[in-house]
Regions:
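Signature of long, low-cysteine stretches enriched in small and polar/charged residues
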Residues: 97-144, 217-310
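Post-signal peptide N-terminal segment of secreted/secretory-pathway proteins
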Residues: 20-41, 48-140
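Bacterial N-terminal signal peptides that target proteins for export
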Residues: 1-7
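C-terminal motif of bacterial Sec signal peptides marking the signal peptidase cleavage site
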Residues: 16-17
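Charge-rich interaction segments
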Residues: 187-231
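N-terminal export/ancillary region detector
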Residues: 52, 67, 138-140, 154-157, ...
Length: 410
């Protein structure tokens, strides 16, 4: 056998071995089928996304009115679904009491809570000091019960300029509606079970999704008007992995893809230390004309590392603790000796093949909803029409004009 024939045989053996190694097992195929066959559609800002049926998630968005230095903003977050009026009232009562219990030691120990005002049976406005200070800087929260969805709107005011901030919150509260079918959300920014039909200028949002009691997590970042990154994803990946991983990682896949009908890139890597392995998949889109229906989108799927504990389905979701201002959350803190032992890091619960198959199914499902962005209203448009007096006057003028032509006929 010649040397050329020997190398040819070795190449065939190597390729055959690689192909066999990369073939998914029957168990992997079964797992992928279970994860991707019956997926649930979620509303995702101006778009839609399909995720494995047992995943849950949430998110928040910040809306900007105006793009200059004098812009204002409102943060919107869904605190709970399936919330009754009784739970809504109880949560608000606890929240107000916890904030009021803290004293502003810069203002002669007056309560941090300035006011709590019920606007309607389903909405309450809270105002409290942003921090312990003599300055007139406040946080304003409008808590809403939109059918059975608990929504919190939050904005800040400075130098005692309170009225326009509260007016903005009250106006926005009339522009939030519950959505039962994400596909039918219509125009507006969708945040889980609600759609926000506000005429704002910019929106920045983050979403998270994960399976129950798992090490797997998907995070999505949306910025409507953000320009594209100057350096493409593959360039930043090489730099970041060199800095944080000393270049010691597995490049599972990388390259251009399409995301929501826009150009995009993906970078899929795996890395290990002495205790466990992790995988990190990242994708981002690129567009020349940023707009509300062509937002910058970043996706990040991770697996391995920390495994989250299971949620007790019989225990109602805490509607207060996680969104309290930091100065009012002390009652929830536990001493170090009462904290649970840190859990050992785990390897990914998905194989590379399973993770890549789920990743592909998720990214291919991302699409912008038809009619998700409504035209902005003309500020000079008057929709009310003429008053009866104005209509009568217009008719009189028209009649006189027609009569003048009749009089000229020979």
């Amino acid at each position: 056998m010649s040397v050329r024939q020997l190398f040819a045989c070795l190449a065939v053996v190597a390729l055959t071995g690689c192909a066999a190694f990369n073939q998914p097992s029957e168990l992997e195929k079964k797992n992928v089928s279970e994860l991707t066959t019956h997926m649930r559609t979620w509303a995702l800002g101006r778009g839609l996304i399909d995720l494995p049926a047992n995943w849950s998630g949430g998110g928040d968005v910040k809306l900007y009115y105006g793009l200059g230095a004098d812009h204002s903003s409102v943060a919107v977050r869904v605190l709970g679904e399936g919330v009754t009026q009784e739970r809504f009232d109880a949560a608000l009562n606890e929240r107000a009491h916890r904030i009021a219990a803290v004293k502003n030691d810069e203002m002669n120990d007056i309560p941090m809570l300035v006011s709590a005002r019920r606007e309607t049976p389903q909405s309450v406005m809270l105002q409290y000091y942003m921090r312990m200070t003599q300055r007139q800087t406040f946080v304003h929260e409008l808590h809403l019960l939109v059918e059975d969805v608990y929504v919190m709107l939050r904005a800040d005011s400075f130098k005692g300029n309170i009225a326009p901030v509260e007016a903005r919150l009250l106006e926005l509260s009339t522009e939030i509606f519950k959505v039962t079918a994400p596909q039918n959300a219509g125009a507006g920014f969708a945040l889980g079970p609600i759609v926000i039909r506000s005429h704002h200028d910019q929106e920045i949002a983050s979403f998270y999704f994960r399976p129950p009691a798992s090490d797997v997590a998907l995070n999505v970042y949306i910025n409507a008007l953000s320009p594209d990154e100057k350096e493409r994803l593959h360039v930043r990946t090489q730099k970041d992995t060199q800095i944080f991983l000393a270049g010691d990682y597995e490049n599972l896949r990388a390259g251009p893809i399409t995301l929501a009908d826009m150009q995009a890139e993906e970078s899929l890597i795996g890395f290990s230390d002495d205790t466990h392995r992790q995988i990190l998949f990242v994708s981002e889109n690129y567009r020349d004309n940023p707009s509300l229906n062509r937002p910058a989108m970043g996706f990040r799927l991770s697996a391995g590392g920390k495994k989250r504990s299971a949620i007790d389905p019989s225990k109602p979701k805490d509607l207060v603790r996680w969104t309290l201002p930091s100065f009012a959350s002390r009652g929830y803190e536990r001493p170090l000796w009462q904290l649970p032992e840190p859990t050992e890091p785990v390897n990914p619960s998905l194989t590379d093949y399973e993770a890549m198959a789920v990743w592909d199914a998720i990214l291919k499902s991302v699409r912008i909803r038809y009619g998700a962005v409504a035209p902005k209203p003309d500020p000079w448009f008057n929709p009310r029409g003429p008053t009866p007096e104005e209509a009568a006057e217009s008719k009189r003028i028209l009649d006189e004009f027609i009569a003048s032509f009749e009089a000229r006929k020979p």
